[in-house]
Amino acid sequence: MRRLLPVLLLLALSACSTTVGIDYTQPSEVDMSSYRKLAVAPVKAYEGLWINTGWIQSVGESPLMNVYPTFSTDKLCRDTASYAGSQLMGTLSASGYYELLPPAETAGLISSGYEALRDAGWQAVLLPEVTLMDLSEKVRSVRRMTRERGADGREILGMETEYILVQTAVLEYTLRIVDTSSGEEIASRSFRDSRTKDTWIDPTHPVYDDMDQFFRNMLRGFNKGINALLVPVRQVYDAKLVKNKPKLKAAGAAYDALASGDRLTALALFRQLWDEERHVPSGCNAALLSASEGDFVTALELLEEVVRETGDGTARDLLNDLSGVSARNSVGEQQTAGLD
């Protein structure tokens, strides 16, 4: 029985669907290929954050309670802008796509206008701004029953009121990109998020903490969108190989080769079975493996041939999907042309 296990395993691998990764370059949403020498201005802080501390009626206890922040709103706005700047520079620097002029140096040049940046060789300037910070709040009370034992051992029931400060923070962060030669805006995008936090308030010490981390978390959440906006990146499209149905015994060797990691042998076998037997799964799989080797032209031509001759729905779906990946890859490669 032991000697049969490897055989059974190979049969299982041959019958199952295997995922093949197809590498491609996902283009950035804004084509920045002509603006890789990028000056980054300091983030403009939001002006106007105001927090309503409000008086809260304390049901059944002290008549009024005032809740006080323990931080300066001006400092919070400045710190948020500073953190946004460090995150932005970190994201762009890590991409390796740009030659960057740091905010401090950009500020010195941009004060004389875009021409000064252009004359210094910078093709575009990124103007980041925190365009909205809002912190709305309310206090809600929760009443719960308490149970205590009196001196005589009898249970005493009571009511206790607890207070919860509910804070909802909203942050909007806007990036503008300007061509330093023409002064025209290349692109603009705003990122917006909101978060809610509940804090239990002690009526004897009704204060709440600095909201700095609250806004920092939202800024970190923008990094992925900023990267997609400005940086072409390598990604992987995972495609499932087509199962051996209708089953062709000769195709088993191709699936086995793939299961053992020999993609080139699997590709050659699948292609041969399509050319000689017109076996649709083999034709589809040969196309996907060609794409995984970076040959999108051969892959698409083969899938077009399969669809044209057989009208197979699976092949048509693969053709549509792979055409989209190939198109994105072409744009992405244009954006990264000349990049080391």
What do these predicted ranges mean?
Residues 80-245:
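Long, contiguous interaction/recruitment modules in multidomain scaffold/adaptor proteins
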Residues 8, 30, 117-118:
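Structural motif
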Residues 4-14:
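Sec-dependent N-terminal signal peptides
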Residues 16-97, 233-340:
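A structural "domain/chain start" motif
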Residues 6, 74, 78, 212:
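Flexible, glycine- and charge-enriched loops at secondary-structure boundaries
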